[in-house]
């Protein structure tokens, strides 16, 4: 598992300090963007079949619970910047779970784009090119581990 530079860690921690205190609204921004990029992803959430609109789904208790879980994964990654390998088993399992429910690995890129969008919207002028790159570096480490778990789960099913 790759490591982040000390500068990347500093930028990520500094930006997450304010965002991490109010996770759900930021997560809703992220998922709103995700569903703009790929509306089909909404169908992977089985509890969204009764929603009249994307916004209705995003405000449902079940979906807000999922948003909270995703934001807690980001929070865990930020909390473990000095020891990302300690999250490897967790991230491998998360990749397996996403493969099992039908998420394809291309969607991971859209989630990354949505994360960056949320950061840009939330941080405003504090969102700089070095900060964007730091988050991209972290996200690529997370996705690499999740993708390994995703692929491993697919291999297990093929056997």
Curated annotation (Swiss-Prot):
<dbReference type="Pfam" id="PF00042">
    <property type="entry name" value="Globin"/>
</dbReference>
<keyword id="KW-0496">Mitochondrion</keyword>
<comment type="similarity">
    <text>Belongs to the globin family.</text>
</comment>
<feature type="domain" description="Globin">
    <location>
        <begin position="3"/>
        <end position="151"/>
    </location>
</feature>
<dbReference type="GO" id="GO:0046872">
    <property type="term" value="F:metal ion binding"/>
</dbReference>
<keyword id="KW-0560">Oxidoreductase</keyword>
<dbReference type="GO" id="GO:0005092">
    <property type="term" value="F:GDP-dissociation inhibitor activity"/>
</dbReference>
<feature type="binding site" description="distal binding residue; reversible">
    <location>
        <position position="66"/>
    </location>
    <ligand>
        <name>heme b</name>
    </ligand>
</feature>
<keyword id="KW-0408">Iron</keyword>
<dbReference type="InterPro" id="IPR009050">
    <property type="entry name" value="Globin-like_sf"/>
</dbReference>
<comment type="subunit">
    <text>Monomer. Homodimers and homotetramers. Mainly monomeric but also detected as part of homodimers and homotetramers.</text>
</comment>
<protein>
    <recommendedName>
        <fullName>Neuroglobin</fullName>
        <ecNumber>1.7.-.-</ecNumber>
    </recommendedName>
</protein>
<dbReference type="InterPro" id="IPR012292">
    <property type="entry name" value="Globin/Proto"/>
</dbReference>
<comment type="function">
    <text>Monomeric globin with a bis-histidyl six-coordinate heme-iron atom through which it can bind dioxygen, carbon monoxide and nitric oxide. Could help transport oxygen and increase its availability to the metabolically active neuronal tissues, though its low quantity in tissues as well as its high affinity for dioxygen, which may limit its oxygen-releasing ability, argue against it. The ferrous/deoxygenated form exhibits a nitrite reductase activity and it could produce nitric oxide which in turn inhibits cellular respiration in response to hypoxia.</text>
</comment>
<dbReference type="GO" id="GO:0071456">
    <property type="term" value="P:cellular response to hypoxia"/>
</dbReference>
<dbReference type="InterPro" id="IPR000971">
    <property type="entry name" value="Globin"/>
</dbReference>
<feature type="binding site" description="proximal binding residue">
    <location>
        <position position="98"/>
    </location>
    <ligand>
        <name>heme b</name>
    </ligand>
</feature>
<dbReference type="GO" id="GO:0005829">
    <property type="term" value="C:cytosol"/>
</dbReference>
<keyword id="KW-0479">Metal-binding</keyword>
<dbReference type="GO" id="GO:0098809">
    <property type="term" value="F:nitrite reductase activity"/>
</dbReference>
<dbReference type="GO" id="GO:0005759">
    <property type="term" value="C:mitochondrial matrix"/>
</dbReference>
<dbReference type="GO" id="GO:0019825">
    <property type="term" value="F:oxygen binding"/>
</dbReference>
<keyword id="KW-0963">Cytoplasm</keyword>
<keyword id="KW-0349">Heme</keyword>
<dbReference type="GO" id="GO:0020037">
    <property type="term" value="F:heme binding"/>
</dbReference>
<dbReference type="InterPro" id="IPR050532">
    <property type="entry name" value="Globin-like_OT"/>
</dbReference>
């Amino acid at each position: 598992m790759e490591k982040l530079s000390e500068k990347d860690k500093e930028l990520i921690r500094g930006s997450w300090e304010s965002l991490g205190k109010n996770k759900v609204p930021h997560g809703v921004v992220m998922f709103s963007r995700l569903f703009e990029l790929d509306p089909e992803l909404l169908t992977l959430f089985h509890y969204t079949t009764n929603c009249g609109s994307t916004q209705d789904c995003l405000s449902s208790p079940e979906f807000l619970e999922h948003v909270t879980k995703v934001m807690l994964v980001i929070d865990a990654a930020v909390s473990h910047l000095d020891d990302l390998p300690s999250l490897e088993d967790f991230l491998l399992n998360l990749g397996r779970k996403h493969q099992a429910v039908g998420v394809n690995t291309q969607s991971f890129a859209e989630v990354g784009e949505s994360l960056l969008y949320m950061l840009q919207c939330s941080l405003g002028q504090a969102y700089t090119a070095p900060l964007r790159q730091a988050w991209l570096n972290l996200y690529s480490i997370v996705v690499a581990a999740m993708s390994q778990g995703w692929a491993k789960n697919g291999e297990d099913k093929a056997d």
